[in-house]
Amino acid sequence: KPGPWVSTKVDSICSYCSMGCNLSYKIFYDHCFTVDNVNGDSHNKGYLCSKGRFGYRYMIDEKRLLKPMIKKRGQHVEATWDDAIKTVVDKVSSIVEKNGPDSVAIFASPRMTNEELYALQKFARVGIKTNNVGSFSNILNNIEYDCLDDMFGLTVSTTTMDELNNADVILVINADLSEENLIAELKIKAAQKSGAKIVTVNSSEIPLNKFSDLWVDPKRGTNTVLIQGISKYISDMGFEDNNFIGERTENYEVFKKSLP
């Protein structure tokens, strides 16, 4: 029988993905003992995905580096934080003095929080005076993010999760939400119970297909052709919302001419 473990509750934000779900850590001594959901007025409504609930184990992984390592004579040697910071300052200062600030680039880890990313870009732009700031996330996930910046001006969604509740039809294209964003999948299923129709476009048998009202299984690599065909049909039938298009988009006529 487990003992009555005394733990400290710490409410926090999950940093695994951009959802930023509210959660609660139960701390036992210096180790994370368990993770619970936070009920109440939070955007995730108490839902947590498996990564948010169980992914905390990486924080106490025995293989995790707890102290800085400096490479000397081809070997990584344990160092103090003061020595590590001084080494970074000396190396970066030497490079900037010799080649200028634009010779330095800062790359962020995909695991960093928004607050850490903000501090890192401040360090780059104010401290080093370079705008060469990037991330390894698109390299690791093989995702191209620039297209969102080009189309929407920001690498963010143009809607909110709560607006799914007001949707009549929800189209999920080439995404496995059970792996990529389980909270979004749970909210889509909840919207379906309120009357929304789910259409999935995916050439793989993802879990959401079992719940969708229509599963379109295109030939791999033809999603763009499918979307162009849908757009062409909407345009030919006059189903587009011209007021919305006029207020929020540019070069729509050019887009229409590009359709097959």
Name the predicted role of every residue range.
Residues 2-260:
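Catalytic alpha/large subunits of respiratory electron-transfer oxidoreductases
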